[in-house]
Amino acid sequence: MSFEERITLVTISFRSKSSLEKLIKNVSDDYEIIIVDNSQDFETTKEFSNKPHLKILSPKRNLGFGAACNLGAKASSRDYLFFVNPDCILKEKTIENLYQASQKYKNASAFSPKILDSKGKQTFKRRSVLLSRKDWMSRVPPTEDSEVTVIAGSAFLIEKTKFLSIGGFDENIFLFHEDDDLSIRLRNTIGPLYNIPSAIIIHEGGSSSERSPEIASLKGFHLSLIHI
């Protein structure tokens, strides 16, 4: 069995048809792909319904990011989950390098790639409002495989049994900081998190929930709660 046949890509869509097209064309048909469509977009369902390696889950309402990820994970028939935003471009061997790391660091819980923005600048998640300052990482991103205290939800690989054993994402967190919460629970329960710089993605940003006024307003509201 190839490593591709052991992995399910789980991606959450909210009016993201154009981004999904690019993502799906960029990966092998040997992967299982699960799209959770939080926008009930008929065009998304119509576009991809004829692909045998791809499943589309259409909940009756917008579940939020974490709950949608959990739904996709439970529908997976593979051993590993690669959660990835639809607006991510995967560089060559990104998933393979993450998978190889998972075989090398057996005690670890999850693996994140090096993330670049659309201009090629690296974005490194080194801290969180949910972490104490002592757990904040250096401003200098890792240049080799390294343990980290938090990973970004935009792209990471995890063994399905490990993800489900802690209940997945906290479904009470609708859209923001659910990856920080997951990172903390994984570190405390399963094992360390790793950043793998040889695995590279470009995160174009914004397309998983198209840059609509209602999404911008929702994000502003959630971020404002941090400072209350």
Q: Which residues make up each language-model segment?
A:
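Cell-envelope/extracellular polymer assembly enzymes that use nucleotide-activated donors
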Residues: 6-8, 32, 181
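Short, well-formed alpha-helical segments that are part of the catalytic scaffolds
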Residues: 11-29
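Acidic donor-binding segment of Leloir-type glycosyltransferases
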Residues: 24-61, 71
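Catalytic metal- and UDP-sugar-binding loop of GT-A-like glycosyltransferases, i.e.
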Residues: 59, 84-86
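Acidic/His-rich active-site region of diverse nucleotide-sugar glycosyltransferases
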Residues: 61, 67-71, 89-90, 97-167, ...
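Short aromatic/hydrophobic "clamp" motif used to bind/position activated sugar donors
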Residues: 81
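Acidic donor-binding loop at a coil-to-helix junction in glycosyltransferase catalytic cores
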Residues: 175-181
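Active-site-adjacent helix/loop segment of glycosyltransferases
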Residues: 183-184, 188-226
